[in-house]
């Protein structure tokens, strides 16, 4: 796959990367389009700490190309808009419906590769 990989502030490079198989509860999405927002700019500019190298992109749409063994809600070929945040689902904030405020939240394209 082709990926825009950030190696440091203002150092983004197009690279070919191996397509990883999904874990049991994961899906692989072929990205058709990705938006750029203020968070992306701050990461690219070095104003927000991330671990390099990072495949950026957290606002995207695409098509499911593979699913893990535990995934039942998605199928290959399905078009999707992605919610990039993983929350714990267990803390008080998550239980109150505020999963976006979870202190254990991880975001695709920010905390882990997009």
Predicted stretch roles:
Residues 103:
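An N-cap/entry alpha-helix motif that binds or orients negatively charged groups
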Residues 20-35, 44-95, 100, 112:
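Glycine-rich beta-strand-centered segment in the early N-terminal region that forms part
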Residues 11-14, 39:
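Short N-terminal binding/cap micro-motifs at the start of the first secondary-structure element
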Residues 1-4:
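Short structural boundary motif marking the start of a folded domain
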Residues 7-10, 34-36:
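Short polar catalytic/cofactor-binding loops
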